[in-house]
């Protein structure tokens, strides 16, 4: 509130974040607020065919070739409730196959403050269908995003209006299907529903 009062303009990346900025003022001298969505350079991230040589090389490097890949790519941090998400992932037992015979696997690409907890949980529960992959160079992000058959886009409960998972814009630009676990009224959920 202190910073907002002294600002000429407050920029947010979501409608729910505009509410977060304006609500503490209760209608009194609300700072001028604008929303500008995050974006992605469509010349850097775009859909690639599943037979793309570099997508196949990425899959092979991380043992994802010929598998159905459910991917989480980005910050493995506090705002994403990954400690609960991994418990959901645990319900899909190793060896589970899709209708076309591909094994279902989960890939977590990135790093962050809860990575060690999630890795430990996976080891302790013998979740052999989960793999962890380090952050990719920006130039290689197109291949890793296109390697996922479907992607998680999640936020922890109570984070609406505080955090906006900008990973969605890359997933949309790569035309990847998304499993959204997002609070009602949160910016990315609104975009998905629109």
Region roles according to the model:
Residues 1-10:
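Membrane-proximal helix-turn-helix segments that form the acceptor-binding/catalytic region
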Residues 16, 36-39:
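Carbohydrate-associated surface elements
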Residues 32, 64-70, 103-105:
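Charged active-site motifs of nucleotide-sugar-dependent glycosyltransferases
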Residues 38, 69-77, 111, 134-135:
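Conserved donor-binding loops in enzymes that form glycosidic bonds
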Residues 46-63:
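A short helix/loop element that forms part of the nucleotide-sugar donor recognition site in Leloir-type
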Residues 64-80, 86-90:
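Conserved donor-binding/catalytic core segment of Leloir-type glycosyltransferases
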Residues 80, 130, 137-144, 151-172, ...:
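Nucleotide-sugar-dependent
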Residues 94-110, 115-140:
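Nucleotide-activated donor-binding/catalytic signature segment of Leloir-type glycosyltransferases, i.e.
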């Amino acid at each position: 509130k202190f910073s907002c009062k002294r600002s000429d303009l407050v920029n947010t990346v979501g409608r729910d974040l505009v509410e977060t900025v304006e609500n503490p003022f209760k209608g009194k001298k609300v700072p001028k607020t604008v929303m500008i969505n995050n974006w992605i350079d469509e010349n850097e991230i775009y859909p690639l065919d599943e037979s793309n040589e570099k997508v196949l090389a990425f899959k092979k490097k991380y043992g994802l070739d010929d598998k159905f890949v459910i991917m989480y790519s980005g910050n493995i941090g506090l705002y994403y409730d990954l400690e609960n998400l991994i418990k959901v992932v645990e319900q899909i037992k190793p060896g589970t196959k899709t209708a076309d015979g591909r094994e279902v696997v989960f890939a977590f690409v990135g790093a962050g403050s809860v990575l060690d907890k999630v890795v430990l949980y996976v080891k302790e529960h013998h979740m052999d269908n989960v793999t962890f992959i380090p952050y990719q160079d920006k130039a290689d992000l197109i291949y890793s995003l296109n390697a996922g058959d479907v992607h998680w886009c999640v936020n922890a409960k109570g984070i609406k209006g505080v955090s906006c998972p900008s990973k969605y814009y890359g997933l949309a630009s790569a035309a990847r299907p998304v499993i959204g676990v997002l609070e009602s009224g949160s910016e990315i959920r609104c975009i998905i529903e629109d």
